[in-house]
Amino acid sequence: MSIDIKYLSRIDIDREEFFFKDSRLMCKKFDEEREVLTLLEFDTKFRVNLLKKDKVYKYFLVSDANHKLLIANLVTEQQAKDLSFIEKDIMKIASSATAYGASDIHFIREDRICKIKFRVNGTMIDYREILSSEADALMFVLYNVMATTKETTWNRKLPQDANIILVINEKAYRFRYAHMPLFGEGGKNYHAVVRIIYPSNNFVCTNYQDIGYNEADTDAIARILNTSYGLFIVSGTTGSGKSTSLKKYIELLFFNKYKGKGCFVTVEDPVEYLISGAQQSSIVADNDDKTKNPFADAVRSAMRRDPDVIMIGEIRDKPTVEALSSAVESGHYCLTTIHAGSVVSVLQRLSGLGMKADKIASPGFLAGITSQKLIPELCPSCKVSFVDERYQRAVFSANENGCEACNHSGFKGRLLLLETLVPTVEDLELVASENWVSLYRKYRERRFIKTGKKGLGEGFSIKDKAYYNVLKGKVCHEYFMLHFGQLDHEDENIIYENYLQEV
């Protein structure tokens, strides 16, 4: 087999000047311009037998067509073990991350080294360090070769995103790639983060017992979902589990309320989890026409498909807000997510995105709001007890050395904290006047309402619920102090009284 391959040694690659020409990545060597599409490494056997070169180098720059031809030939000869070393290294990192249960993989490329870190149970842990040139090769192949959807060719100097699907232990994992250039020598540094989206475990939430919340939170969610129409907003920071919660809520509606007979449509960017009973659409932006808003167009299309329930993956801009408002006002039940830190700040964000306060305050428009956060849960096998001197409470901290049960981290899994708001007429009056401070005070007054339900209900903040779980021995006291800070004595007493009533 004769294959014309343009090749360079690793030293040449490191010294090479790469540039863009007509949206193509090019390199220049000895005044000859070449298009660069794929960086691969092959062992000696295949360099001699397949590439037919008298003089061979460790790395090759090959055209896309030649890359496909090479891979096809290797696969047909069942020599998968001889595929790109770089691809193998990527798979090793991804496999290790999933084995740890990591939510994200961080590549922090500095002038000489690149630090690889995993986020496990909300905490960053060191994985390993590699040479910066090795990191560049990893990112180049990950983006250009392994990504399924992406923008042109990898360019460290521009913010870029991509979606990747990798099969690990016979299961398909989705990865969301994003990088941003960092300050450094020669403009070569960057921070790349790969979010891991784990394969569906086929769990379907068909009743409120499956939701996994305490009685107070379950009651609030049931009241929000049982309205005939309106907007249900799930908020939280990045990585707070909003998509997982949306899946549960939609399945609850489909099986519990509609008895499996409704038309549920989703508009997502991209689809993250398979939702039983829903017709899911993944929206792809048109890179050639930045003026188009595919999200808003997809929402309008969804309204014409005879839906009972519409789910919009995320509120991002004014056109999406307007399209979503039209869907709610036309009598549909709609669910969506937004980035916000509390239920009251969600309303402020909607106002900032162009949704008028009088529209939000219209009776029936807003079904409810949740704000959520995932925090690490203490390992029950090795947590350490002590007395909090300020309040004289028995609390726990993470064991610095951990144990085998928690991979010596001191934490095992994550705990969902949920803040809920089911709006009353008084709340809506304050929303209409955009009196956010009074709305917050009104919301906090609900802490004193006795519901008879286990757990902290409406009126309690995420911080309150984190401390409640400190008292229950589920959350590390030091973690709480670091991420939430001190509670005043009045708030602490209210939470402690609720804790005593439950135990």
UniProtKB/Swiss-Prot annotation:
Assigned keywords, A-Z: ATP-binding, Cytoplasm, Nucleotide-binding, Protein transport, Transport
Biological processes, Gene Ontology terms: protein transport
Matches recorded under PROSITE patterns: T2SP_E
UniProt cross-references to InterPro entries, sorted A to Z: P-loop_NTPase, T2SS/T4SS_dom
Origin superkingdom: Bacteria
MF terms in GO: ATP binding; ATP hydrolysis activity
SUPFAM superfamilies according to UniProt: P-loop containing nucleoside triphosphate hydrolases (SSF52540)
GO cellular component, as recorded: cytoplasm; plasma membrane
Keyword NAD (UniProt): no
Entries under Pfam families matching the protein: T2SSE (PF00437)
Cell compartments where the protein resides: Cytoplasm
Annotated CDD domains: PulE-GspE-like
Binding-site residues, ATP: G236, T237, T238, G239, S240, G241, K242, S243
Stated family: Belongs to the GSP E family.
Function as written in the Swiss-Prot or TrEMBL entry: Involved in the translocation of the TcpA pilin.
Protein name: Toxin coregulated pilus biosynthesis protein T
Natural source organism: Vibrio cholerae serotype O1 (strain ATCC 39315 / El Tor Inaba N16961)
Gene label: tcpT
